[in-house]
Every structure is written in structure tokens, then in C-alpha cells.
């Protein structure tokens, strides 16, 4: 099935606003690309991972009307400030090729690279996670995923069991296994996410250490680490479940939280967990703590 693709070029400070607008308008995928051929490495904590000029690609179903979409997007912009744009009809195979051309390796910490599965890793001796997320799932460029990967690279995961709740592409579960964990359970309500996770685990040689599950079918095991990169609302609902899924002394890593939601999350989880100082990237927060 063909798609309608919008391409808009904005500054780094405008990316979040535009991405949110595109998602609200019905985009099935929003991808951030380098607009000026500027190299991107995973930055230190607190620094933006975006290029100074960023091209935002948004994919809409073919049934969408481009003129209506543009009118909707322009409503919240002054006429002279709306970004330059173009749109085109994109066949499935062309979208996949374009996406593959722009997915570049990213480094997290001193030892982990997230690399496209079709390119050789920049540092073959490093810990290399080969990722092929497809249209629907992320690659590590979003601040919440970057925060989680950075935290995992600094943790002692040897012989650990980890639960990745809301796994998407499986990037966090697979990273944990590549960094020394011996078992991982990847949980997601979307069957396509579970399929993508299994395929990515196979590409990385860790499928024998990984189980996938929907939330409704999850067996309540105990984990040494539980990471949940979702959103504040489901995190608030899941606090008691996460307490049941973790050993005393186990680590809990929560992301997908904005700065103004920290206190509500801490109050909800305070019955079971003690948290360290938040890690913040842009306005996104990672809360890491341990089970009492």
C-alpha cells in the first residue's frame, strides 16, 4: 500500500512541537533525519541528541488529504514561521529504502553501539546491537530510549534477569542481554512489537535467552531489573505489578516521564521503591531506584 510522506525542515527546538502535531494529525510514523549532513553521536547526559537542523518525515495513510493535513498543521503557527515542506506519494518499498539510508549507528556510553542490521558496526570489538525496527518502532534516538540505554551501559547486568515492559523493537531487552544479562522477558500489548523483538533478538544471537509476552499472558516471575519506557499514565497504574515482579534489592528503571510528572510517579511508587536522583534529557526523565 502506498503512503503519503511529508518532509518538513525545522530547528532542533521546534522538533518536539512539530512531531507532536504530526502524531495528533494521524501520522503512523514520524522519523527525525539530519538536514545538513551533520554527524551525530550519542551526547553526554542533559544534551540534546538532535541535529541543529532536522528534517522531520511523517508517514500518513494514502486516504489522507494533504491539503487538509497542511491546514491542520498550520493552525498553530504564524504564517511566516511555518517550516518549509514538501509531500509525495511513497510506495512501501521506497519508504523502506529511504528509511534504511538514514538510520545511522549511535553510540551509548563507552561500550554500546546501536547499528542498522544492514551496515557493518563502526567498532567491531564493541558491544554492537544490530537493529531492524521496521516502520513502527524506535531506534534509540528518542531521549527516553537514550536515557535507558545509557543507564544500562553503566549497570552490572552480569547473570541478571530483566523485564522490558513496553518493549517496542526490543532494543532495551536485547541491549541488556548483550551487556551481560542472562535472561530477558519482553512485554508489549502490540503483537507487531513482539514480532519485531523476536526478529531483532534473532539477528543479535540472543533469541534463546529471550521470552516475549503480552501483558495479559505475563507470568509473574521475579526480575533483577525491570525497565519500562512507556508513559506516566500507565506507569501509575502498573506500580503494584512492578513491585510484584521484582526481588527486594532489584532495580526499577522508569522513563517516558516529563519533568512535571516526577513527583506523582515518586509518590505512587514510594510504598515499594527508593529512587536515586532523576536523569534528565531535554524535558524527559529517567527514574531509577531499587526495591525495598
Swiss-Prot record:
UniProt-listed Enzyme Commission number(s): 2.1.1.-
Protein name per its UniProtKB record: Ribosomal protein L11 methyltransferase
GO molecular function annotations of the record: protein-lysine N-methyltransferase activity
The keyword S-adenosyl-L-methionine is annotated on this UniProt entry: yes
GO biological process terms, semicolon-separated: methylation
Originating gene: prmA
Gene3D superfamilies linked: Vaccinia Virus protein VP39
Function summary: Methylates ribosomal protein L11.
Family: Belongs to the methyltransferase superfamily. PrmA family.
Reaction equations catalysed: L-lysyl-[protein] + 3 S-adenosyl-L-methionine = N(6),N(6),N(6)-trimethyl-L-lysyl-[protein] + 3 S-adenosyl-L-homocysteine + 3 H(+)
PANTHER family: ELECTRON TRANSFER FLAVOPROTEIN BETA SUBUNIT LYSINE METHYLTRANSFERASE
Coiled-coil regions listed: none
GO cellular component: cytosol
Binding site for S-adenosyl-L-methionine: 145, 166, 188, 229
Lineage of the species this protein comes from: Bacteria, Pseudomonadati, Pseudomonadota, Gammaproteobacteria, Chromatiales
Cell location: Cytoplasm
Keywords annotated in UniProt: Cytoplasm, Methyltransferase, S-adenosyl-L-methionine, Transferase
Top EC class, one word: transferase
Keyword Oxidoreductase: no
